[in-house]
Amino acid sequence: MIAGYENSDINLYDKPDDWEDRVGKFIPEEDRKVIVSSPTKRCISTAKLLFDRFPCEVTKSLGEFECKALGNKKFWEITEEEFNRLVFLPASTMEKRAKIVLHDMGNDIRHENNTNAVIAISHGMLIRYIYHYMTGNPGISAYDVINSKGFKFSNLDLLIVDTVKKTVEVHHYKDPIVHK
């Protein structure tokens, strides 16, 4: 999560009628009992919207990074050099965070709740980085992750990570947004 990022809520009536058929079907009912979320209103509301209940746990272990120096610029509006000058976020920091999250979700929370699955609702950057980490690209730059290089992930998409088998599945709700 980006520190200071808009902590807006989402409309709980905006759930697309076809989300369950297109994406939700990949999460069996028995795997929906444990939902963990970032503390932002948007993530908490997403749990309520998609699963009709609030998260059973809100965690700050998903982390955030500081990018106030970017001002109001959108990530896709700046060059990599400009980003690297203004934001210090090496791949090693993202890798540490991914390992913590995967360990927490894959081991601690799963075992504490006696379940085979944990639904984690987080932010696009962390989700995109975990995809790269799990598919053998842990050294990708923060700039490339933020700008979706090599992996697009949009609202209502689903990333399933099996921490035991070390596999990743991606289910897109709709075609990813492309910024110009």
Predicted features along the sequence, with ranges:
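Short catalytic/ligand-binding loop motif for oxyanion handling, primarily in non-cytosolic enzymes
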Residues: 1, 42-46, 65-68, 127-130
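Beta-strand elements within well-structured catalytic alpha/beta cores of enzymes
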Residues: 1, 36, 112-126
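Active-site-proximal alpha-helix that buttresses catalytic centers in soluble enzyme cores
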Residues: 1-57
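Phosphate-handling substructures
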Residues: 2-11, 50-104
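Acidic, low-complexity terminal tails and accessory targeting/binding regions
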Residues: 10, 26, 57, 64-77, ...
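Generic structural signal for well-ordered alpha-helical scaffold segments
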Residues: 21-28, 99-110
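Active-site catalytic microenvironments for nucleophilic, acid-base chemistry
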Residues: 49, 53, 104, 108, ...
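Short Gly/Pro-enriched loop/turn and capping motifs at secondary-structure junctions
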Residues: 125-128, 136
